[in-house]
């Protein structure tokens, strides 16, 4: 049995029938005894960041569909721990979340680009169980 850890990429089976994960690549962000959490990397949402967050018209970052769980939640992964405190490490270079106001400030000042940070609506969750 293979172990899954943060930073692992899962590629969907080509014959998978679940439309949520059809032709998907999922980045595992957290894995422990109670389940696994990740984000679908390759499904861009039809709306941009400013369509979801009112009053922030100057931020035109794309948003990605992270998965079918909690579609009313906004998450982000980034490569700027020096500018965004509090992120959880996924790999040595990639972090999940952190101080949202610091992320917005970095974007507004041009220190953070779409190459450095991605927003996700919803997330993917696999729950562990035993038989």
Regions found by a protein language model. Give the residues of each.
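A short aromatic-anchored loop/beta-hairpin motif
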Residues: 1-120, 124-131
